[in-house]
Design a protein with these regions (language model features):
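Active-site-adjacent structural elements that line small-molecule/cofactor binding pockets in enzymes
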Residues: 1-162
Length: 162
């Protein structure tokens, strides 16, 4: 499909009489494959085998060492089992946050957390405020963008700059 081949596909779950991808993919040999999730037995094994990138979920209240850092160790072990270079997989995380009544303290905590994520090997972070989505929260995020870009510069990771 990504090569412009429209030959029929007959699979166990899907039958495609004329698979068509229009417009054709720009990236060669195919678009980057990102697999999201943190299942340790299947999902991270599939990441190690097939993906160009993964997106993990930063579960609120789970310490970094038991959460994201642990998932990255599991991914590394799957890469070793597959004979895959762990470093060639981009690691992303989706992190939900709430600034709380003390916005300044909430911002400090968020910046520190993103710095910690970069330090354990996260390349990209998607930060999502928990509702309500208001202009003040978004403006507060904008106010720390220079600091987040500085994390990227120091670590080589874009974890905090997304």
């Amino acid at each position: 499909m990504w090569r412009g081949d429209e030959s029929p596909f007959e699979g166990r779950n899907f039958q495609l009489p004329r698979p068509l991808n229009s417009p054709n993919a720009v990236q060669k040999p195919h678009p980057p494959i990102l697999i999201g999730g943190g299942g340790e037995k299947k999902t991270l094994r599939l990441v190690a085998k097939y993906a160009d990138a993964c997106n993990l979920f930063d579960v609120p209240g789970v310490p970094l060492e038991q959460g994201i850092a642990h998932k990255l160790r599991v991914l590394r072990s799957h890469c070793e089992a597959e004979g895959r270079d762990y470093a060639e997989i981009e690691k992303a995380v989706t992190s939900f946050f709430q600034l709380g009544p003390d916005r300044e303290a909430g911002l400090r905590n968020l910046v520190d957390h993103l710095r910690d994520l970069a330090a354990v090997g996260i390349d990209h972070a998607i930060v999502s405020p928990r509702g309500p989505y208001d202009d003040a929260t978004l403006e507060a995020l904008v106010s720390v963008l220079p600091e987040l870009h500085a994390i990227e510069t120091r670590t080589g990771s874009a974890a905090a700059a997304q």
